[in-house]
Amino acid sequence: IYKNRQFNIPYFDFNRRHYLEYDLIKAINSINNSKIMKVGILSPFIPTSSILKKIDGLSLFEELKKSYDLAAIPFFSKKLPEDIDLLLIIGTNILQKEMLYSIDQHLMSGKNLVILLDSFYRINPSNNQTQLSISEQINDISDLLQVYGVKINSDKVIGDINYSSPVIDKRQNQINYPFWMKIDKKGINKDHPINIGINNLLFVESGELITLNENHEKLVYTTNQSGIVDNNLFKIYNTNNLINEFKQDNLSRTLSVILYSPFQSAFNKEENKLKNHISSSQNNPSIILFSDTDWIFDPFSLQK
């Protein structure tokens, strides 16, 4: 603990033995760096007034507060604060055009993005009233991502027979539900340091990520026993009916990916871009993208 910040070195974790030097250097650099990294959070789920308090259902944020300064950005703002080092975006189906431009320029300036989107929001169902829709114009976050190299298939929900979770239906019968995917080590890229120490993840009615170039690395993925179902059916069908709709199609699907630079601005063709517009990425930023938001909330992230 240094200057009221907690720096963890997981050197007792056998799974991270190959990354001990990396963890040590990272911790030492954090201590020597007088500037604490500021993480901006842009989400309709996080009120700006609540970020300094303990947020019910989001223990993840309490862990982040140990190492970073967190700042909740008003959801309908038109511009990001300039002092944000990293931007965390959660469930932003609707954003103003000016904010989309600000996010684009944040990335182009060399700052990283972490983005969580979804096909069906279980924890925050009001978000299901709107849906991402890729278009030729830059209208939502999915349009930005397509320019950066990935398409989110947000109108389909992914299931996997091999990762099915037991749930209770209305008749109190236990059934295996393929759309709540308990992903084990076979579906987690253990070659990337970000995943070391993760034994399983629970992705809940997730979407699919389709990469459009080679500048990426898959982080989380299904087996080849996956399938897709239209997300609108999840609003009207019960659990058993949804299971009956599921048909596996021998395809493995990507659920999380890291995109590497270089990136081109999504607004290079816009006439109203600012005079100091940055057209291509500087200093090698990256984007970490997840096709599910529910997995970070306590009901699905904390083991009981």
Segments (PLM) and residue ranges:
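Hydrophobic targeting/anchoring helices
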Residues: 1-63, 74, 302
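Acidic, S/T/G-rich, low-cysteine, solvent-exposed domains in lumenal/extracellular/periplasmic regions
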Residues: 33, 50-304
